[in-house]
């Protein structure tokens, strides 16, 4: 089925984001890339590594968007609970994906490192998802077709997330969603504050059709 809605939500998962230990650059990058595809991000949510909090965020996102991108919580340690929560959310069980398992074995063989039990668990994925290959790391991405909403779960490591999104997610989005063309035009002004400019063009701005949006982005230049 083709989705006609072009609204998306981004959910970032991880205590390290909420306590300010790391800066969430994934959302900004995803927002830009989704915008290029004609998909508007209307909501961003950050939640802790807590099953109940993640489950609530997944439920609420479905009321707002037809595409939900989730990053984080796919690592091999016990605090990474995203995959288990998604399995419960979709009433699914975790199964071993043989392709992922083989890829994990190749990685650890190349690195000449032993595989721990926690590493093997990264080959476990919800039975109901489409696995998104991660050639840049060990945690695969996952694509879930919900009743009205598509959920995509990606690793929180930026370069892994970007690789999977570009190579695996974008082609699926183009196939699944009816995407509008979006054009951005920048008009630069100098010597006038945004409030004065807004007053001058108020009548023109009010006459714009609903599908055309105007944003004021003031920048202050300091000459040294």
Residue ranges and their predicted role:
Residues 149-224:
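An accessory alpha-helical subdomain
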């Amino acid at each position: 089925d083709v989705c006609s809605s072009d609204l998306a939500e981004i959910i970032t998962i991880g205590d390290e984001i909420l306590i300010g230990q790391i800066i969430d650059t994934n959302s900004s990058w995803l927002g830009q890339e989704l915008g290029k595809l004609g998909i508007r991000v209307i909501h961003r949510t950050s939640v802790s590594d807590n099953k109940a909090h993640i489950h609530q965020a997944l439920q609420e996102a479905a009321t707002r968007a037809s595409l939900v991108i989730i990053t984080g919580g796919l690592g091999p340690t016990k605090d990474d609970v995203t995959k288990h929560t998604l399995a419960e959310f979709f009433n699914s069980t975790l199964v071993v994906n043989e392709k992922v398992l083989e890829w994990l074995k190749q990685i650890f063989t190349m690195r000449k490192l032993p595989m721990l039990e926690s590493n093997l668990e990264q080959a476990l994925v919800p039975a109901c998802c489409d696995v998104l290959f991660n050639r840049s790391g060990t945690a695969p991405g996952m694509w879930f077709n919900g009743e009205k909403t598509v959920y995509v779960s990606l690793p929180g490591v930026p370069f892994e997330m970007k690789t999977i999104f570009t190579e695996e997610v974008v082609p699926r989005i183009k196939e699944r969603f009816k995407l509008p063309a979006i054009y951005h035009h920048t008009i630069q002004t100098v010597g006038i504050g945004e409030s004065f400019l807004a007053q001058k063009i108020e009548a023109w701005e009010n006459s714009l059709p609903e599908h055309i949006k105007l944003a004021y982005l003031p920048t202050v230049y300091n000459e040294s």
